[in-house]
């Protein structure tokens, strides 16, 4: 089974995707994490991807498709997986559907622009283990100490500023809304109210996916 999490930046795709992945024992694949790992290398792909990320622009389809197809060719993903951040538009969806045969379920997290901006501006992560926190909604239990690994070193993403965030939201509306309409014809398409709190969103997703 393949589960695709769709939604604008800051919708909580990564948070919810990881939770569901853990409960149903499927690998969680975040295209953003893949790109950030590539950026840390000195490859030509890193230079190309970084130029788009710094401007808050979406990476061209041919680059994204090539990377994701190669990544999914691993035997680790033969039994299914959860995708976070891919596909982002109709062209990517058509490419993806051309080489996968498994049943696809789609979870769309619908969130207001105002809440998205607040979530993203307050977002930071533990530099050691990657645990995500938020200045407004999810601080560590002990101030400046990671709940998971106890590190005291945190980092904000450099592309998380209000101007870039608004541009990313606008790009999402232009590029991804047609994809939402495409998947609405799928019996396994589920729209989730992403304005609710983390636990309420998780409960709703579990209900539609029939996870006990």
Swiss-Prot record:
One of its GO terms (biological process) is AMP salvage. AMP binds at residues 36, 57-59, 85-88, 92, 157, 168. One of its GO terms (cellular component) is cytoplasm. This is Adenylate kinase. It catalyses: AMP + ATP = 2 ADP. It is an enzyme of class 2 (transferase). Pathway: Purine metabolism; AMP biosynthesis via salvage pathway; AMP from ADP: step 1/1. One of its GO terms (molecular function) is adenylate kinase activity. Keywords: ATP-binding, Cytoplasm, Kinase, Metal-binding, Nucleotide biosynthesis, Nucleotide-binding, Transferase, Zinc. Residues 30-59 are annotated as: NMP. It comes from Rickettsia bellii (strain RML369-C). The lineage of its organism: Bacteria, Pseudomonadati, Pseudomonadota, Alphaproteobacteria, Rickettsiales. ATP binds at residues 10-15, 123, 132-133, 196. The keyword Amino-acid biosynthesis does not apply. Consists of three domains, a large central CORE domain and two small peripheral domains, NMPbind and LID, which undergo movements during catalysis. The LID domain closes over the site of phosphoryl transfer upon ATP binding. Assembling and dissambling the active center during each catalytic cycle provides an effective means to prevent ATP hydrolysis. Some bacteria have evolved a zinc-coordinating structure that stabilizes the LID domain. It is found in: Cytoplasm. Residues 122-160 are annotated as: LID. Zn(2+) binds at residues 126, 129, 146, 149. Catalyzes the reversible transfer of the terminal phosphate group between ATP and AMP. Plays an important role in cellular energy homeostasis and in adenine nucleotide metabolism. It holds the Pfam family ADK.
